[in-house]
Amino acid sequence: MIVAEIYTQADGKITGFSIDGHSGTAPRGQDIYCAGVSTVSQAAYICIYEHLKRSFQGNFGNGKLSLILNNPPDEATEAVFQTMLIGIREIEKIAPQAVKLIVKPQTLSVGSPINQDLPKIS
């Protein structure tokens, strides 16, 4: 199962996310649910990194993707994160056996390291 955790601060604004797992509904590389969750979450990660140029700690690779902002969320990051959240929520609605979405308060403080060795996205 794909587990998508969305982290929020006290006011509900999204501070980051973590995606892990495989839906198990088809072989790797052929799974539409994995492709959908991967697409919306990678698009958010790349947008925060390349377009918004926000500072964050994250992990990208080996079937896992995570991002925690180094600074409080703003209107632009919230728009990106909410778009991702809506996409994952819709996939979960049609495939609850494959995708589990969890929205929860962030337990790490903004800027806490997840992985210091971030790969370059080209």
Language-model region placement:
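N-terminal intrinsically disordered, cationic/polar leader segments
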Residues: M1-I32, Q42, I46-S122
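Short, conserved glycine- and acidic-residue-centered signature motifs
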Residues: Y33-V37
